[in-house]
Amino acid sequence: GSYLVSGRVAYPGVIVSLLGKPGLKSTQMTFYDLNAKVNRVLSDRDRIYFSVYSGGDHTVFDRLVQGYGMDWGNATATLRWNHVVNEKVYANCSAIFSNYYYRYKSLRDGLRYLWKSNMQSYQLKYDLEYAPSNTLRIKSGSALHVFSTMPGSVGKYGDMSNVVPYRMERRKMLDAALYGEVQWRFWSDFQLDAGVRVSTLSASGSVLYKSHTFFLAEPRAELSWRLDHNSRLSVSFNQASQNLHMLSNSSVGLPSDMWLPVNSILKPITMRQF
């Protein structure tokens, strides 16, 4: 087995605060990233991989534009088991977690508040690949994805605040999917890639809308012809669905983006590409 650990930290706020300008003396800016990867050989056919990542940005600009602060952060962890069934079949089983958040702090007198938003993702995946020959490769798998987001909440930041706390309702979505794909090379210069992913999306309800379940099919196909070593001619079709929607306000000069899963009102968006 082997392992890898790395990280970095930056404090540019120290340099900014030393510039001598009164409006910059209380400035805080900190950035960090941490990575760790470990893999271990269990047997000739089995190997385990584990990786984690954590990163964050912290900024405070006191007195500048009356004072504000912003924080971003992201953390992920992945555990993957690779198993070789035989010389033609191998499988991967993965468990994945991710968490993203951001916070905005207003430091104005009388309007000191903290805005928070976060979203979490939990995934289980099983992928199987079968290569019966040098010209044929078959892939299949399943996935279970639980998505949870708290679009936003606002609360008092300190004692000198007139803000009325408010918290938006947490939204959840369950995505269960199966997929299959075939890659076939024939007549030496032709290759066909075709597959389909089918899924059911179960969205939780609220006081504004009912819980709802969507059935989605996402087929794709590509036929390519290799003209020579540097040229290829291909024709393709692809259909994909977007199950998360970002709501943003371009007129507000702060990170106001909110991610929402689909529901009975905000339906999935389908894209078809030729």
Residue ranges and their predicted role:
Residues G1-V41, Y49-Y53:
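Predominantly transmembrane beta-strands of Gram-negative outer membrane beta-barrel pores used
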Residues R8, Y53-S54, A143-L144, F237-S241:
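Short, solvent-exposed turn/loop segments enriched in Gly/Ser/Thr/Pro and often Arg
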Residues S26-T30, V60, G69-G73, K116-Q120, ...:
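Short sequence motifs at beta-strands and strand-loop junctions characteristic
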Residues Y101, S148-D159, S202, W225, ...:
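Surface-exposed extracellular loop regions of Gram-negative outer-membrane beta-barrel proteins
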